[in-house]
């Protein structure tokens, strides 16, 4: 990040960055990384409409992360700020719930965009919500109440062996940290976590 732009594997301001040494390719920005991984790992849907919807889910997840971290800590959480934000968080959750409903998602079965196997939209959904709900019980309760099918999908996908292994590695490397620093401390304070 501190290197001159001319020496960076790809021009970027900050993480995340993905370097695919096999392909001699680097890319920054979460949505671009997800698109690259989805394409190279053959996890993107077959139709243009479902690929576009997948990228909408990816960008929505990125927006939720920006909002829950108050744009990376431009401000800190207060009880009032959290109370004002909670209806918006519920609306975000309802977007996932309605998307899943429109594609046949049920509490015990199905995937966010339909189909017979999980795709990028499911992995991003599970990663977003499980990372948050594993650390903040109040957010978990809101998700369960507001978007029960999304909560169930999140658990099913997060329990897949590869994602469970990744979550265990993250727990080992980072403990119960969510976003770190003062912003996480303020979030934990307002949520009593």
Language-model segments: residues:
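GST-like domain detector, emphasizing the conserved glutathione-binding G-site
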Residues: 1-91
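Acidic/histidine-enriched, glycine/proline-rich intrinsically disordered or flexible terminal extensions
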Residues: 170-193
């Amino acid at each position: 990040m501190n290197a001159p732009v001319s020496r960076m594997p790809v021009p970027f301001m900050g993480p995340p960055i993905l370097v695919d040494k096999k392909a001699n390719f680097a890319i920054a920005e979460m949505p671009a990384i997800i698109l690259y991984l989805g394409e190279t790992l053959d996890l993107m849907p077959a139709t243009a409409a479902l690929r576009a919807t997948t990228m909408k889910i990816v960008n929505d997840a990125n927006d939720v992360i920006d909002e829950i971290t108050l744009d990376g800590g431009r401000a800190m959480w207060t009880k009032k700020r959290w109370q004002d934000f909670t209806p918006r968080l519920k609306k975000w959750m309802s977007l996932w719930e309605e998307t899943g409903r429109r594609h046949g998602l049920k509490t015990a079965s199905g995937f966010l965009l339909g189909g017979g196997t999980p795709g990028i939209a499911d992995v991003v959904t599970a990663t977003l919500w499980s990372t948050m709900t594993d650390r903040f019980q109040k957010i978990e309760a809101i998700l369960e109440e507001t978007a029960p099918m999304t909560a169930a999908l999140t658990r099913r996908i997060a329990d897949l062996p590869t994602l469970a292994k990744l979550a265990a590695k993250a727990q080992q490397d980072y403990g119960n940290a969510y976003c770190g620093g003062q912003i996480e401390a303020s979030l934990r304070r307002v949520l009593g976590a």
